[in-house]
Amino acid sequence: MAYRGQGQKVQKVMVQPINLIFRYLQNRSRIQVWLYEQVNMRIEGCIIGFDEYMNLVLDDAEEIHSKTKSRKQLGRIMLKGDNITLLQSVSN
């Protein structure tokens, strides 16, 4: 355990991945998904549902090609968890 100054304890709390995804869902955060073995393409959208396999339902999804910076509107999609490498929140 880490300590700070006058004997005050600093407690580190582990965050479960499912809790982070749930927070993105609750806050209606726009997220960017990095895809497995698709380094030049990313998906952005708002999580409106997910399951224990990390399958995501995204609303207002866009396919983003990083080399050409082009965007393709996809609408509402279901993205299988097997395709997900990283999730990050993006500002609108």
From Swiss-Prot:
| Main localisation | cytoplasm
The record, for InterPro entries, names: LSM_dom_sf (IPR010920), Sm (IPR047575), Sm_dom_euk/arc (IPR001163), snRNP-E (IPR027078)
Residues in Sm domain copies: 18-92
The membrane-spanning stretches of this chain are none
Q: Which Gene3D superfamilies match?
A: 2.30.30.100
Task: Cite the GO molecular-function annotations of the record.
Answer: RNA binding
Q: Pfam families annotated for this entry?
A: LSM
Question: What's this chain's function?
Answer: Plays a role in pre-mRNA splicing as a core component of the spliceosomal U1, U2, U4 and U5 small nuclear ribonucleoproteins (snRNPs), the building blocks of the spliceosome. Component of both the pre-catalytic spliceosome B complex and activated spliceosome C complexes. As a component of the minor spliceosome, involved in the splicing of U12-type introns in pre-mRNAs. As part of the U7 snRNP it is involved in histone 3'-end processing.
Question: What is said about its interaction partners and assembly?
Answer: Core component of the spliceosomal U1, U2, U4 and U5 small nuclear ribonucleoproteins (snRNPs), the building blocks of the spliceosome. Most spliceosomal snRNPs contain a common set of Sm proteins, SNRPB, SNRPD1, SNRPD2, SNRPD3, SNRPE, SNRPF and SNRPG that assemble in a heptameric protein ring on the Sm site of the small nuclear RNA to form the core snRNP. Component of the U1 snRNP. The U1 snRNP is composed of the U1 snRNA and the 7 core Sm proteins SNRPB, SNRPD1, SNRPD2, SNRPD3, SNRPE, SNRPF and SNRPG, and at least three U1 snRNP-specific proteins SNRNP70/U1-70K, SNRPA/U1-A and SNRPC/U1-C.
What name goes with this protein? Small nuclear ribonucleoprotein E
Origin organism is Homo sapiens
- Cite the source lineage: Eukaryota, Metazoa, Chordata, Craniata, Vertebrata
